[in-house]
Amino acid sequence: MKLPSKVKIVEMGPRDGLQNEAEIVPAPIKITLVDKLTNNGFRFIEAGSFVSPKWIPQMADSSDVMAGIRRKAGVVYSVLVPNMKGFEGALAAKASEIAIFGAASEAFSKKNINCSIEDSLARFEPVCEAAMSHGIPVRG
């Protein structure tokens, strides 16, 4: 087996690390976190997600976070999007990259994104097409 010549590490703390916190973390603190990660050399940062605030209230301020961060050349600021509505938010927020998420099992898919694997793939298709038409890379 040949190992890859390089590895891409994506810092997920501002999104995955905070999304399940019971107490809402204010946008200025999230902005400070992203800025500190940037200043400490992280090149790929998942800064938020454009999901339903009903399901993930912690991410309701992702547009404010994306608007408030001090972007640095060479750093990719991505956001997670589950559907076209999320993509529109990511586009307006000038995300450098979007992330989509899927599941390997039907049970996890239903629990995590409230649909079957087949339905999730159908949702991702227009998101990926829209991202490509706007020159936005997709990770997932």
Describe the predicted segments one by one:
Residues L3-E11, K30-G48, K54-A60:
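N-terminal glycine-rich anion-binding loops that anchor highly charged ligand groups
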Residues V10-K30, V75-M84, S109-I117:
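Active-site mouth loops of central-metabolism enzymes
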Residues G41, A92-I98:
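Glycine-enriched alpha-helix->loop->beta-strand junction motifs that scaffold or abut catalytic
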Residues F44-E46, S78, A99, R139:
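Conserved beta-strand positions in the central sheet of alpha/beta enzyme cores
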Residues N83-K94:
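Catalytic cores of alpha/beta
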